[in-house]
């Protein structure tokens, strides 16, 4: 499988803030990212991301409509 095939249908989003760690063992990072293409272009959403991530990284989102719940909300 080539890189082009795996990114088919994905939307790029730039990480603008790392909110914190989430998950039972802190394995995921919650980030705020700005959608760069498509109908939601310019919208800022909160997502959970696995693996190392920092501000300025561009991640590929399969779905831009879903948002993650806030960390430690009551």
UniProtKB/Swiss-Prot annotation:
Gene Ontology, cellular component aspect: cytosolic small ribosomal subunit
CDD domains noted in UniProt: S1_S28E (cd04457)
Superkingdom of origin: Archaea
GO MF, one annotated term: structural constituent of ribosome
Matches recorded under Gene3D superfamilies: Nucleic acid-binding proteins
Coiled-coil annotated residue ranges, if any: none
Annotated InterPro entries: NA-bd_OB-fold, Ribosomal_eS28
SUPFAM superfamilies to which the protein is assigned, alphabetical: Nucleic acid-binding proteins
The UniProt record lists the keyword Ribosomal protein: yes
Pfam family, one: Ribosomal_S28e
BP term (GO), one: translation
Keyword check for Ribonucleoprotein: yes
Alphabetized UniProt keyword annotations: Ribonucleoprotein, Ribosomal protein
HAMAP family: Ribosomal_eS28
Family in the record: Belongs to the eukaryotic ribosomal protein eS28 family.
The protein's name: Small ribosomal subunit protein eS28
Taxonomic placement: Archaea, Methanobacteriati, Methanobacteriota, Stenosarchaea group, Halobacteria
Gene name of the encoded protein: rps28e
